[in-house]
Structure formats: C-alpha cells, structure tokens
Amino acid sequence: HAEETCGVDKNLAARFLVPLMEAHAAKSFALGSPAVDGARAIKSVEEQELMRAASATNDQAMIRFRELVHEGATEREIADELEGIYRELGASGHSFDPIVSFGANAADPHHMPDDTKLKVGDVVLFDVGCRQDEYCSDMTRTFFWNEPTAKQREVYELVRRANEAGRA
C-alpha cells in the first residue's frame, strides 16, 4: 500500500498541525500550498466583482469611521464602533482585528487599540478590513488630527515618495 501524504497549508497554525500529525502518525506531511496557491490566484469575473464589493463596503466604512474621530476619543472606543458599521453596510464583520493607532502608536504596525486618547497634532492610522460574501478587504489610511507640524509633513512626503517609487 502506497505511502499516504497529507498536504498542509503554509498558514496552518501549529496548534492544529501538531495534533493532526499525532493522530495520523503513519502519514507523511508536505507543504500543500504550492498546489493550490496558483489556482487561488485566478479569479473569475464573479469573484472579482465580490472582491470589489467588499472593498467598496470598506471604502464606505472608512468614511463613517473617520467621522467618529474626535479629540479625547480613545483608540479602543473608535475600534469598537467598526464592527457595527460593517454590519450596517452588509458585511459579516472584520476580516482581521482592526488597528487604530494615535500618535507614537501609529509607528507600530501591529499595535492593538488601547486607551490612548487622541490629541491635537497626532498621526491617526487605521488598518481595517471587512468580510463580505466570504471575500475580505484590507485598507490602511494615515492622516493628521488637525494640522501636521513641519516635521510631520516632511516625513509624510518622504514616505509618500518612497511608496510611489516602490510601485513604479
């Protein structure tokens, strides 16, 4: 009887993989992602439309999300409102834990919203996404609360130019 091989996704967490390997010790395990990644990259017209719809919902949510921002609000207060906004717009919820960062926290790409309060001159960063019809959106936006300082403008322009050069 030929050896059985189980293909495993590259993102499968160890807490799932280890018990699977223990339960099926007679099988060999191999990375299965290359066999499906190429197929997943090809999207039908219908899938592309669903992806665009999820992104459009995220665009609408971002407009409403920015309207919630006010001096003295905490990152956590703003982040907690997002789930309801997504549901009102027809999404089933977040596609990942939202990142809402004020001030120095905006420099941490994996910052989790906390009780930091927004104050004049802060950088505000939103990294949010929704799940709609099993498709996910992801959007990051950075803006300044009130007017940026000269140094903030300089850094912003440097990052913007680097981003544009990277996409050219």
Which residues does each predicted region cover?
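Active-site neighborhoods and metal-handling regions in enzymes and metal-associated proteins
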Residues: 1-168
